[in-house]
Amino acid sequence: MKKIGIIGAGISGLYIANLFKKNPKYQVSIFDKKNSLNIDEGYGVQLSINSVKFLNEIGFNKLEKNEKFNPEKINFYSKKDEDKICELDISEFNSNDCKYTTLKRSTLINFLKKDLEDLIKTNYSVSKIDQEQEKIKLSFENKETHECDYLIISDGVFSKSRNLVSNKKIQPKYNDTLAIRLSLIHI
């Protein structure tokens, strides 16, 4: 059995862990630096039909309909004068089982972690990553170590682990754009 180490218990880390968990040839361990997973209600997520297609492979299509929303269009407005620039009909890209979807980030995280609770280790901040022969050795700030055959780094845009592997500090690049997303509910 091959051991898979996943650094980061966000959306991508939990998604890939679900895929590996389905295969008995792999043993998965997920490490996250925080003391608990962030399931605050305040954030929303937009899922393209391609991402919904992949999430359906792990049961996303069984999520209750009242926990997600399938918008039909996106309106684009000018920041400067608040005029509507255009409207995009996103429903034309939908299929019966894969629709452009919005939902709370907390709903998506709860869905992704529901079968992984026993695999997630919190308060595990990586301090060192070493390649030793055929194994990868992870050292953590809590003085614990873990060995794995394969390592998946998914700890976000400000990834400490990526910097440890590349031996240099990699900074995200920004292009001064902003996206504001909201749903208007008609009463």
Give each language-model segment a name.
Residues 1-12:
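Beta1/beta-strand and adjacent pyrophosphate-binding region of the FAD-binding site
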Residues 21-41:
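Glycine-rich FAD pyrophosphate-binding loop
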Residues 36-54:
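Conserved N-terminal glycine-rich FAD pyrophosphate-binding loop of Rossmann-like flavoproteins
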Residues 185-187:
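Conserved small/polar residues in nucleotide/adenosyl-binding loops
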Residues 12, 36, 158:
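Conserved Rossmann-like nucleotide-cofactor binding loop
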Residues 4, 48-183:
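Conserved N-terminal helical subregion
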Residues 16-26, 54-57:
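A short, Lys/Arg-enriched amphipathic alpha-helix followed by its capping loop at the start of a domain
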